Structures are given as C-alpha cells and as structure tokens.
C-alpha cells in the first residue's frame, strides 16, 4: 500500500519548523499555509517537533491558531507534549540534572563566552527551557542581518563546533548531548532528550502505520539527526518550505 492510500489516522507527518515550514527564524508564508492546511491536513495527521519553546512556534507559525490546526505540537524536542491544543505532559531538566550541575554548567558557559572573541555580541546568551538549555555565542537579541552574518562567520570559524568540543571535555561526567540547530545557537540536553523523545509519547498512545519526518539539520550533530535516522520514521531531508511542499505533493499524490 502506498503512503497516498493510507487513511488520515494511519499516517503521521512530523515537521521541524526552521528550514522546513518556514525559512530560518522567519514567518510562514500565506501561500504555504494555504497549501498545508487545505491540502495536507485533510489527508494526514500532522505534528510539529521543534527545539524552540511554544512562544517561538507561535511567532513563526502565525500565532495560537496552531493549537487548533495541528494534532500534535512538541516544543523543546518533545519534552513538552501538546495534543488537541492542550498540554498533556512535560519533562524538566533541573529535576533530571540537579540544581548544582545546572549552576556549574551556566557559570562555565558565561565565563567561556566572556572570553570568546566573535565579531559582535548582543544579549541573551543562555536561554533556559523546560527540557534543554540553548547557548548562543552572539546573543539571541541580534538582528536578522547580524544573525546571517554570524552564520557565515561560523561556517568558516566553527565557533559553535569548537565550543561544544570544550564543553564535552569539561562536562564529561554529565550525561549531556549537544546539538547544533538554526544559524546562531546550539542546544544542550540530557542523553535521549533529542527529537526522538516525542516518539515515546506517540508510541505509547497511538498505532500509526507510517510516521514521516521532515527536517533540515539532519547531519550528525544537527538537531534533526537522531529522529531523521531513527528506524521508526520515514525521513525526508529538506532545506526550504518549497522542498517540503514538493515532497508532500509527491508522497500524498496531491
């Protein structure tokens, strides 16, 4: 049986946000929204799984209406689980690691960043979330132009890659995973708390015949890698919403 022949409740389509439903840190276009909600949603169960918190998902996907449009929303790699617009579960990194370890990590990162020489620095260098910490060497309060500039700088100088290497050495005694996502930051979370975490919730409550995942950061070290390479998913590497639309049109025969 082809994917297109499956009933809506037999297939789940899971999507990353940046580079998949939107361009990086941009808002979804009206054209893509129209295609997605009018043609894809009637054909398949739909969900989003992102590293960002729910508020950032609201910003990029045109507000709180996604609570009604998506069957599943998994912010913070699925450490927060939302079904039918209601939160049904949440995990907490402080309870898992302990306050002393979290404090030690944050203190080290702040010292490290204070001595790091990058072209610009702005504000919000560490963002604390339920299931992870997000570290941004230039600060998340940068403009879009500054974000793009750092992304190019990082390709050449590998700022994030080098910092992760140093953190792995310093915190070898702590069960932490480091994952580069987006243009300017990286996520830090306990082992196994990557995007595959959402599959635990899905498998515990549902029996889909196929689970498809769409994402862009699918290389080792990228924040889509674990779920992209998981045998439970049929995965599709994309780089833009146009790629996503093209593949959806093909597999659902729209």
From Swiss-Prot:
Subcellular location: Cytoplasm
Cystine pairings recorded for this chain: none
UniProt-annotated binding residues for Mg(2+) 1: 16, 18, 216
Assembly, per entry: Homodimer.
Classification via InterPro entries: HAD-like_sf (IPR036412), HAD-SF_hydro_IIB (IPR006379), HAD_sf (IPR023214), PMM (IPR005002), PMM_cap (IPR043169)
Highest taxon, organism lineage: Eukaryota
Its biological purpose: Involved in the synthesis of the GDP-mannose and dolichol-phosphate-mannose required for a number of critical mannosyl transfer reactions. Required for maintaining N-linked glycoprotein glycosylation at the neuromuscular junction (NMJ) synaptomatrix, and thus acts in multiple pathways that prevent NMJ structural overgrowth, restrict synaptic bouton differentiation, and limit NMJ neurotransmission strength, in order to maintain viability, coordinate movement, and in adults ensure correct wing positioning.
Lineage, opening ranks: Eukaryota, Metazoa, Ecdysozoa, Arthropoda, Hexapoda
Active-site residue numbers: 16, 18
Reaction catalysis annotation: alpha-D-mannose 1-phosphate = D-mannose 6-phosphate
Record carries keyword Nucleotide-binding: no
NCBIfam families given in the database record: HAD-SF-IIB
Location (main, coarse): cytoplasm
Keywords: Cytoplasm, Isomerase, Magnesium, Metal-binding
Pfam family, one: PMM
SUPFAM superfamilies noted in UniProt: HAD-like
Stated name of the protein: Phosphomannomutase
Family that this chain belongs to: Belongs to the eukaryotic PMM family.
């Amino acid at each position: 049986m082809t994917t297109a022949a499956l009933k809506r409740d037999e297939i789940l389509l899971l999507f990353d946000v940046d580079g998949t439903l939107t361009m990086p840190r941009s808002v979804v276009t009206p054209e893509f929204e129209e295609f997605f909600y009018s043609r894809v949603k009637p054909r398949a169960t739909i969900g989003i799984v992102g590293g960002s918190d729910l508020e950032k998902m609201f910003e990029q996907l045109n507000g709180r209406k996604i609570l009604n449009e998506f069957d599943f929303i998994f912010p913070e790699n699925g450490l927060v689980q939302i079904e039918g617009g209601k939160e049904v579960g949440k995990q907490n990194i402080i309870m898992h690691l302990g306050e002393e370890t979290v404090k030690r990590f944050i203190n080290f990162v702040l010292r490290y960043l204070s001595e790091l020489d990058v072209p610009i620095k702005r504000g919000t260098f560490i963002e604390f979330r339920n299931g992870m910490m997000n570290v941004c060497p230039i600060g998340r309060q940068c403009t879009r132009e500054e974000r793009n500039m750092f992304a190019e700088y990082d390709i050449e100088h590998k700022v994030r890659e080098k910092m992760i290497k140093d953190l792995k050495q310093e915190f070898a005694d702590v069960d932490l995973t480091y994952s580069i996502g987006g243009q300017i930051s990286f996520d830090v979370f306990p082992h196994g708390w990557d995007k595959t975490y959402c599959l635990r919730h899905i498998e515990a409550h549902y029996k889909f015949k196929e689970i498809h995942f769409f994402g862009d950061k699918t290389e080792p070290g990228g924040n889509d890698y674990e779920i992209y390479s998981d045998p439970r998913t049929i995965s599709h590497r994309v780089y833009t919403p146009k790629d996503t639309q093209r593949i959806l049109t093909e597999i659902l025969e729209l």
